[in-house]
């Protein structure tokens, strides 16, 4: 893979319509070179015998049994509400009606 230089960064910035100063172009060329080197290192280590994975460790959900616990009655729930109507919480309107 070819090295990324300042001219490559300037070209990419132009294609992406990103204005970059001279110092930003120089700094970005160095940062992208480090990234390319890192990708090269990983590419050299990963062989054809390594299976493709989406995550480095297996994913598994930890689930608990869905059991019914203590349930409050509707009256108990609404007893702490500042206002209730027809068995529901009553809140101030926030949208205008047409």
UniProtKB/Swiss-Prot annotation:
Keyword terms: ATP-binding, Ligase, Nucleotide-binding, Protein biosynthesis
Its GO biological process terms?
Answer: glutaminyl-tRNAGln biosynthesis via transamidation; regulation of translational fidelity; translation
Catalytic reaction annotation? L-glutamyl-tRNA(Gln) + L-glutamine + ATP + H2O = L-glutaminyl-tRNA(Gln) + L-glutamate + ADP + phosphate + H(+); L-aspartyl-tRNA(Asn) + L-glutamine + ATP + H2O = L-asparaginyl-tRNA(Asn) + L-glutamate + ADP + phosphate + 2 H(+)
Name a GO molecular-function annotation. asparaginyl-tRNA synthase (glutamine-hydrolyzing) activity
Keyword Cytoplasm attached: no
Q: What function is annotated for this protein?
A: Allows the formation of correctly charged Asn-tRNA(Asn) or Gln-tRNA(Gln) through the transamidation of misacylated Asp-tRNA(Asn) or Glu-tRNA(Gln) in organisms which lack either or both of asparaginyl-tRNA or glutaminyl-tRNA synthetases. The reaction takes place in the presence of glutamine and ATP through an activated phospho-Asp-tRNA(Asn) or phospho-Glu-tRNA(Gln).
Q: Read off the PANTHER family from this record.
A: GLUTAMYL-TRNA(GLN) AMIDOTRANSFERASE SUBUNIT C, MITOCHONDRIAL
List the NCBIfam families hit by this protein, alphabetically.
Answer: gatC (TIGR00135)
Family according to the record: Belongs to the GatC family.
User: This chain belongs to which protein, by name?
Assistant: Aspartyl/glutamyl-tRNA(Asn/Gln) amidotransferase subunit C
This chain's source organism reads: Renibacterium salmoninarum (strain ATCC 33209 / DSM 20767 / JCM 11484 / NBRC 15589 / NCIMB 2235)
């Amino acid at each position: 893979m070819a090295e990324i230089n300042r001219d490559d960064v300037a070209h990419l910035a132009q294609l992406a319509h990103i204005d970059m100063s001279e110092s930003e172009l120089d700094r970005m060329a160095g940062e992208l070179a480090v990234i390319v080197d890192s990708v090269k290192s990983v590419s050299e280590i990963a062989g054809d015998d390594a299976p493709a994975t989406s995550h480095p460790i297996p994913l598994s959900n930890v689930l608990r049994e869905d059991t019914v616990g203590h349930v409050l009655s509707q009256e108990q729930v609404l007893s702490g509400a500042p206002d209730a109507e027809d068995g529901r919480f009553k809140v101030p309107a926030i949208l205008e009606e047409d």
